[in-house]
Amino acid sequence: MPRSRNPSQGMPRDSSDSCGLSPVETPKGKKRARSLDRQVPRKKDPESSNTRCPSSATCRRTASDGARSSESPSHFAEAQGATAAALPPGEGRGFLPSEQGPPEDTKKERLPREAQQSWLRLVLNILLMRIEEPREKASRASKGKGDLPEAAEEPALRKKSHEKRTSRKKHSHRKPIAEEPPGPQTAEAQGREDVPPSLAASSAPHEIALGLICRGGPDSDLPQALPTEGDHAETPDSFGQASGPPLEEDPRKPDQDDVIWQIVELLKKAGDQLEEEQVQIPQPEAVPPRKPTPLPRKKSQEKKSSLKRVLSLKKPASEEPKRVGTATTLGPETRPKRPSFLPLCVSSQRASTSSSLDLEAPEFQEVPSVDGGGSHPSELHTPAAIFQGPEEKPLLDRASESREFRRKILVLLQSAEDERGEQEAQAQEAEKAGENPTPAGKVKSQVKKSNLRRAFSLRKHSSKDSKKTEASGTPGSGSLEARPPKKHGFLPMCVSGHRASISSSPESLEFQKTEAAGGAPAGSPGAPFQARSHTPDEGPSPERAWESKEFMIQKLVASLQEVDRDLGRQIRKYPSFKRFFNEFSDASLRKLVATLERQKASLSEEGRSLANRPPPCAFGTLNKFAATRSCTICTLMQSRGEYKGHSYAHFLSRKAEQDITNLDSQSPD
């Protein structure tokens, strides 16, 4: 552009003179300023006028001066009000955003206003910097000590800064993208207006670069990194920049403080959470090891208690069957291996305990011992105590009476067989005596020999029968009754008992089976009879034989009640004793009936003739004999003397002493 052009159209002369520039030099600087700011319109708010850089040196000081003046925004507002009052009304309109109109493109109206505003800005900056210097020093000292929370104490200033920032964002959204950074360019243009043309021409390219750096506006962080707080040269250029950056840095400072406070609060919250977690974490770790430790102890204690209960239950359960076995003699394992002198009276009749009550007693005793696994030992002793207390006597009495009853019946049967054998022997002797008469001494010796032979033959038969039962595998083959005793006495009647009489009869095997099995059951009286083979004497069908057997049993019971009071009383007291007769064959029953009938006849004859009764001495010897042998055979053996033609007492008077001496000499005891 030609330098002869007058740039000061519409502008007073004193203003151009106050700038100290010649009319030739001023248009050059303004021309450059216009060329830089041709595309960028000015900001409408009053803060944008304070953000312009007058020179490159002042652009370097922007961030440091802004940091100094950010602590005193109130003073800046006061200074701004003073400048507004000092300006004339025509010039003050340029600072207000509401009254500021759109920029004019004519050179005559724009250039004088820019020069005037630049000079006024310099004066105001100098005044403000002189006022704010002591306050900036105080604020630096407080920052060096770490007094950061000043912004937290001034919430009103924060609100203002947030409002200003939001207003700027609104203005920036309204403008195009190319028009966003107008502040630094206008500031550079105004700075060039204030600089002489000779200096401006030399520093033009450098200022353009600095203007581009400062063009970041309020959103760029470069102005904060460029300056340092050590540069505090108090020049008019630096004073002129004091009022510009505070409003740019004001919205940022509170933001940084807010961020710092937010970070501090977050750290505090995180620390509290960590402390709470550290307090809560050891509790679940410490508690679980404490809780499971008593659990195995409880389990081990329960196991020990259960084992103790089982052992304590096993001991009384094993002891109770032993007690019951000794009291009631249940099986062969509780019986003695070697019988005493009279196994018939002591151990052979144990099968009589197989009655209904005797069968119920061991069941009652065995149930609590088997099922008492979960009960307490004290509960198991109570039934045993009750059983062994008042109920033991009746059971023992019944068992003893049944044994006594069986023994008497067997003795009666043995006597009947002996009588038959004697009758046969006497008949044979009579025949021989008729042919060859022999002395009486020889006859007696022959009778004794026949008796001995019969006894030994019975021994052989009994041993053979026992072997047969063992070979057949009967349930009672292992018992002591089925085995022959090791030592036999002279009297097979007392030693081997009923075996002698039954072995001669065809039903000996069946009778031994029933004796070994413990007698006939209570509910099946006909079982042993059906399993037993019939003799040829019985003849017809089993039904007739059963009817005849029942009739004979009734007749036998009636005769027993008449002949022997003790046996009759026992049958009346225990009707189940009648089942014992089912074990005998019909032949043996007939023998018993015949023997009892003969005894009835003898008793009736003795009642008629008192002379035939034995003297008291004979009864004394009989009682003595019965006491020593534990056999009451007085009434059963009275028929013995009738066949010889004299009474039983007379027979005893002649042979009692001789027979007793023979028995004592030949018996094992």
Curated annotation (Swiss-Prot):
Coiled coil: none
Biased amino acid composition, Pro residues: 285-295
Pfam family of the protein (one): CF222
InterPro entries in UniProt: BNIP5
Skewed-composition ranges (Polar residues): 48-73, 346-357
Keywords linked to the UniProt accession: Isopeptide bond, Ubl conjugation
Biased composition regions of type Basic residues, renumbered to the chain: 158-175, 445-462
Name of this chain's protein: Protein BNIP5
Lineage: Eukaryota, Metazoa, Chordata, Craniata, Vertebrata
Gene name, Swiss-Prot/TrEMBL: Bnip5
